[in-house]
């Protein structure tokens, strides 16, 4: 599943390519994703101009004139594909956004766990109302993290992945951030020291920023709208490295399951 860095890369690409473009048509080939695509999406968006594109958590948001917002989540396998001319549609091209200059954005999602909805301004605010803090903001710090987690009994990795606490830090970047901070994913979130909260907040920011700079992580499905792959996976310390030696100490990387998710860590470096 694309996480914060991948969605940030996608949103930045789209901001450059489709901001101030007018939507001429929306073609829906499959209305049933994890939730139905907004009824009458074509009528709602035809003639609207994209005024801004931003990210919230793992969602990309296209704000249009008329105070409408296109909310897109890529699910497990979704992609947004940028085309500069008419492009033959593929089996899993569920939604095509056509622009007046004949460019288009295609939402492709083989597993159909994605989301494409249109909301007004008030609905957009309510949709994201219970989301946690954005980890790349100035507010996100050791002090903030300590206050946020001081009473949380859950293990620290699960806490980092709780969207109501912190948005966008999925399985990959939680594992990598904890390794960089040298903190075991098994530790209760409330039991870290202040210095550990401070270190972890910094390493979450560093890991996410490094991944964005690398274009995200391409493991299976993810690609940028241009078709280019990300390459942050080449810099992984622990994720997907089970039974391989740790890059720091040569200890063998361990794989466990936490809340149904794979967790990779070095039990020598992380404590």
UniProtKB/Swiss-Prot annotation:
Catalytic reaction(s) noted: Hydrolysis of DNA containing ring-opened 7-methylguanine residues, releasing 2,6-diamino-4-hydroxy-5-(N-methyl)formamidopyrimidine; 2'-deoxyribonucleotide-(2'-deoxyribose 5'-phosphate)-2'-deoxyribonucleotide-DNA = a 3'-end 2'-deoxyribonucleotide-(2,3-dehydro-2,3-deoxyribose 5'-phosphate)-DNA + a 5'-end 5'-phospho-2'-deoxyribonucleoside-DNA + H(+)
Signal sequence residues: none
Cofactors that this protein relies on: Zn(2+)
Keywords: DNA damage, DNA repair, DNA-binding, Glycosidase, Hydrolase, Lyase, Metal-binding, Multifunctional enzyme, Zinc, Zinc-finger
GO BP terms in the entry: base-excision repair
Binding positions (DNA): 92, 111, 152
Molecular function via GO: 8-oxo-7,8-dihydroguanine DNA N-glycosylase activity; class I DNA-(apurinic or apyrimidinic site) endonuclease activity; damaged DNA binding; zinc ion binding
Function as written in the Swiss-Prot or TrEMBL entry: Involved in base excision repair of DNA damaged by oxidation or by mutagenic agents. Acts as a DNA glycosylase that recognizes and removes damaged bases. Has a preference for oxidized purines, such as 7,8-dihydro-8-oxoguanine (8-oxoG). Has AP (apurinic/apyrimidinic) lyase activity and introduces nicks in the DNA strand. Cleaves the DNA backbone by beta-delta elimination to generate a single-strand break at the site of the removed base with both 3'- and 5'-phosphates.
Known partners and oligomeric status: Monomer.
Protein name: Formamidopyrimidine-DNA glycosylase
């Amino acid at each position: 599943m694309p996480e914060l860095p991948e969605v940030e890369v996608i949103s930045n690409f789209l901001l450059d390519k489709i901001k101030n473009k007018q939507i001429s048509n929306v073609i829906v080939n499959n209305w049933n994703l994890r939730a139905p695509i907004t009824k009458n999406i074509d009528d709602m968006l035809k003639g609207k101009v994209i005024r801004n594109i931003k990210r919230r958590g793992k969602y990309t948001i296209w704000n249009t004139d008329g105070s409408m917002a296109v909310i897109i989540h890529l699910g497990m396998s979704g992609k947004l594909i940028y085309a500069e001319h008419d492009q033959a549609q593929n089996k899993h091209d569920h939604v095509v956004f056509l622009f007046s200059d004949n460019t288009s954005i295609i939402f492709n999602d083989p597993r159909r766990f994605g989301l494409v909805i249109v909301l007004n301004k008030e609905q957009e605010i309510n949709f994201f109302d219970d989301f946690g803090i954005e980890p790349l903001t100035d507010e996100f710090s050791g002090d903030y993290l300590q206050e946020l987690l001081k009473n949380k009994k859950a293990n620290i990795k699960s806490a980092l992945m709780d969207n109501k606490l912190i948005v966008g830090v999925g399985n990959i970047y939680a594992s990598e951030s904890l390794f960089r901070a040298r903190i075991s994913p098994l530790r209760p979130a409330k039991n870290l020291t202040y210095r550990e909260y401070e270190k972890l907040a910094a390493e979450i920011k560093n890991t996410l920023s490094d991944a964005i700079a690398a274009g995200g992580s391409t493991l299976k499905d993810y690609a940028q709208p241009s078709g280019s792959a990300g390459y942050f996976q080449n810099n992984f310390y622990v994720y997907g490295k089970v039974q391989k030696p740790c890059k720091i100490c040569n200890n063998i990387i361990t794989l466990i399951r936490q809340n149904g998710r794979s967790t990779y860590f070095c039990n020598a470096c992380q404590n």
